[in-house]
Amino acid sequence: MTVPKPLKKAFTVGTAAVAAALLSLPIAVPAGAEPAPAPAVGSTQWIVVGVPAASATSGTLTAFQRVGQQWKTVLGPIKAMVGDVGVGEGADGVHRTPVGTFAFDQAFGREPNPGTAMPYFQATTADWWDQDAGSPTYNTHVQSAANPSSVTENLYDSGPVYDYAVNIAVNPQRIPGKVSGIFLHVTDGTPTWGCVAIGRSEMKSLLTWLDPSANPRITIGVGDPALLPAQS
């Protein structure tokens, strides 16, 4: 497993210290959004995205690796772009990044697999993400020579932002209309349609670091930082 080179000196804190720090932080949850819980027991990789206000379109991303009872910073904090109407409760057709703690499932990119252990496919013009709430393949990856439904995103034609990406499993139950196609991907320097976006080299490093056996999670919230790992 490759750990990305930290962009600044890494720090290590014990679980108790992190929990105490968490309680002292000015954490806010946007109206209509559920508080972001800690990752499931067994997670040893955690990505935290924090924004200064629910209406903010950028914030920071920090990646943590759990070693024993300690969390170590392995990347960040780095700049991260979020939805062009900020963060809060997600919904199809609303460019808002969902708040909460979520798993990662499917990685992909226009570029070859950079060495990630996550399930990965190299996107072509035949790769789509179905966002049609009335489709039987809603909120899934679809391979088709032609557009498979009325509301889709072509994962190749969308351009360099999808050179490297991973799906944030915000709506794994695929509840129609709840939210679909929320990814962590490469930034083009502008706010997103609801995804989280970071620099290309950092995105590539994160993919090589992510390991499904570590039960990786991402937490998105409001605060400075939004949340810190406080898992016992």
Segments from the language model and where they lie:
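Secretory targeting and sorting signals
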Residues: 1-33
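Cell wall/extracellular polymer interaction/catalysis modules
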Residues: 34-192, 203-216, 223-232
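Short cysteine clusters
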Residues: 195
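A conserved hydrophobic position in a structured secondary element of the catalytic/binding core
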Residues: 198
